[in-house]
Amino acid sequence: MSRRSLSLWFPLLLLLLLPPTPSVLLADPGVPSPVNPCCYYPCQNQGVCVRFGLDNYQCDCTRTGYSGPNCTIPEIWTWLRNSLRPSPSFTHFLLTHGYWLWEFVNATFIREVLMRLVLTVRSNLIPSPPTYNSAHDYISWESFSNVSYYTRILPSVPKDCPTPMGTKGKKQLPDVQLLAQQLLLRREFIPAPQGTNILFAFFAQHFTHQFFKTSGKMGPGFTKALGHGVDLGHIYGDNLERQYHLRLFKDGKLKYQVLDGEVYPPSVEQASVLMRYPPGVPPERQMAVGQEVFGLLPGLMLFSTIWLREHNRVCDLLKEEHPTWDDEQLFQTTRLILIGETIKIVIEEYVQHLSGYFLQLKFDPELLFRAQFQYRNRIAMEFNHLYHWHPLMPNSFQVGSQEYSYEQFLFNTSMLVDYGVEALVDAFSRQRAGRIGGGRNFDYHVLHVAVDVIKESREMRLQPFNEYRKRFGLKPYTSFQELTGEKEMAAELEELYGDIDALEFYPGLLLEKCQPNSIFGESMIEMGAPFSLKGLLGNPICSPEYWKPSTFGGDVGFNLVNTASLKKLVCLNTKTCPYVSFRVPDYPGDDGSVLVRRSTEL
């Protein structure tokens, strides 16, 4: 072939190798027109459905690694990557078996390699900058710039679809009260299989309420936590006015009161902030903290007290190191140190416990310094819904020899002071929490929370559970029995929804069969982990500009962050050191070590 012929063929070959330009497609011809074609969720692999005219659509497959009318044809590298990637269930099996192998891995550089892989793979599943919100099912400047909104991972179900969940399922969703009573209400207490205790439950609730603060006035699509991450607004308040009321303005410290020789949060008489207590509770009995609802549970006020003491303790250490610093610098630097301590404890103890992994998780921001990573986070509505873990709550609360019902426990303003921090930490560390997944484990006192979440998801028109599984790289379930792993609940779900592709997001998470020896199912892990890790490592203190000793007041402050632990947090702020762990003491690994399941080891 001549050189001229080659020069003519080469451009043609290039054109053949390029993915075809998406064409505008007609909707399913079997359905009477006009039906919004995006109601069928035709675009796969994160392709974006764009409607044209009444019944035409086009899938935007840009940078998905796929092409074709519905983004289903993988590019060569995508195909190769998918072929080599292990399934989530196999990965989970590897990480939770072979204890002695992981002991070796954790002692070598392989731990950091795997940790970097975990962080990047998980975090890349979360779009940054944010994409959608409750008012905009398309990319908009408002979705990016207005931090009053929760972001959304998937756009809402189009309003003009044949059924509430798109095109599948019944014309009307099941009665939410009936759904909750049949499938979520506890028959008998099912304990968490990992030995999880209610100290873990209270830590989770206290920690997450700094960024889950849905606006009652503006609606469920809006948040009052404008920091969208770990900013400790639940300690310092979510606005400057509240913060100023809580500060002592001396040596960087927060206001406090001394009761029976111990430090506790101030009363609302001493710090004039709004706290939500029942009518009739006198102001001197209302403790003032950053989050206005923490008076609800003694467990929440317990952690508020511990973090208050930690803040003032760190202020003393910094004051000794930097006698020339003024109140403002002491306060601001201490806040950064406590943010670092929080992230350290959450990753290395809280998430470690949840995962059940033998891989020892590590908080080390430098692992991501060479990766493409955005140090900014936006809380998603789906993350907020996912994190309603009220099955953790027991039937009653045991403190010493005394058993408290919900009626006695809620808004109990004297329990914390009467027992003291040490006694409550010890008691909560010894009481089993409930299993989250698998269904039928909501105590009737908290069942209304599940009802409210489902109602909110319907108002916000969240897409079906299976669409979220696909969004996070999981295979959609093909039947209710595959979802639940048993026949009875599957039959009830079939009766209620009619189609597995019409199952709602939150019920799907709560009714999915649990992973072996796990507190919940595959979807909760595979969806929750990316949100969590992106939010934690996306914090500004983890960026190259912030992550250095000078940010934290020098080596003393930096060392506080790098050596933080749950036990230190409690025991450095109490006169005696109680039993403190996220696992009950009569469970294997109660000393904080990783649980060894010898019967199932490789």
UniProtKB/Swiss-Prot annotation:
What is the organism of origin for this protein? Mus musculus (Mouse)
Membrane topology label: Peripheral membrane protein
Q: Which InterPro entries match?
A: EGF-like_dom, Haem_peroxidase_animal, Haem_peroxidase_sf, Haem_peroxidase_sf_animal, Oxylipin_biosynth_metab
Q: Which domain of life, per UniProt?
A: Eukaryota
Any single GO BP term: regulation of blood pressure
Instruction: Give the protein name, as stated in the record.
Output: Prostaglandin G/H synthase 1
The UniProt function text for this chain reads: Dual cyclooxygenase and peroxidase that plays an important role in the biosynthesis pathway of prostanoids, a class of C20 oxylipins mainly derived from arachidonate ((5Z,8Z,11Z,14Z)-eicosatetraenoate, AA, C20:4(n-6)), with a particular role in the inflammatory response. The cyclooxygenase activity oxygenates AA to the hydroperoxy endoperoxide prostaglandin G2 (PGG2), and the peroxidase activity reduces PGG2 to the hydroxy endoperoxide prostaglandin H2 (PGH2), the precursor of all 2-series prostaglandins and thromboxanes.
Name the positions where heme b binds. H390
Q: Could you tell me the keywords of this UniProt record?
A: Dioxygenase, Disulfide bond, EGF-like domain, Endoplasmic reticulum, Fatty acid biosynthesis, Fatty acid metabolism, Glycoprotein, Heme, Iron, Lipid biosynthesis, Lipid metabolism, Membrane, Metal-binding, Microsome, Oxidoreductase, Peroxidase, Prostaglandin biosynthesis, Prostaglandin metabolism, Signal
Nucleus: present as a keyword of the record?
no
* Disulfide bond entries: C38-C49, C39-C161, C43-C59, C61-C71, C571-C577
Task: Kindly list the residue ranges recorded as spanning the membrane.
Answer: none
- One Pfam family this chain carries? An_peroxidase
* PANTHER family attached to this UniProt entry: PROSTAGLANDIN G/H SYNTHASE, PROSTAGLANDIN G_H SYNTHASE 1
Limits of the EGF-like domain: 34-72
Name one molecular function that GO assigns to this entry.
Answer: prostaglandin-endoperoxide synthase activity
Active-site residues, as the UniProt record annotates them: H209 (proton acceptor), Y387 (for cyclooxygenase activity)
Sugar-bearing residue positions: N70, N106, N146
Q: How is the cofactor bound?
A: Binds 1 heme b (iron(II)-protoporphyrin IX) group per subunit.
Gene3D superfamilies according to UniProt: Haem peroxidase domain superfamily, animal type, Laminin
Q: What else is known?
A: The conversion of arachidonate to prostaglandin H2 is a 2 step reaction: a cyclooxygenase (COX) reaction which converts arachidonate to prostaglandin G2 (PGG2) and a peroxidase reaction in which PGG2 is reduced to prostaglandin H2 (PGH2). The cyclooxygenase reaction occurs in a hydrophobic channel in the core of the enzyme. The peroxidase reaction occurs at a heme-containing active site located near the protein surface. The nonsteroidal anti-inflammatory drugs (NSAIDs) binding site corresponds to the cyclooxygenase active site.
Q: In which pathway does it act?
A: Lipid metabolism; prostaglandin biosynthesis
- Oligomeric form and interacting partners: Homodimer.
Q: Where in the cell is it found?
A: Microsome membrane; Endoplasmic reticulum membrane
The UniProt similarity line reads:
Belongs to the prostaglandin G/H synthase family.
**GO cellular component terms attached to this protein's record:** cytoplasm; endoplasmic reticulum membrane; photoreceptor outer segment
Which reactions fall under this protein's catalytic activity? (5Z,8Z,11Z,14Z)-eicosatetraenoate + AH2 + 2 O2 = prostaglandin H2 + A + H2O; (5Z,8Z,11Z,14Z)-eicosatetraenoate + 2 O2 = prostaglandin G2; prostaglandin G2 + AH2 = prostaglandin H2 + A + H2O; (9Z,12Z)-octadecadienoate + AH2 + O2 = (9R)-hydroxy-(10E,12Z)-octadecadienoate + A + H2O
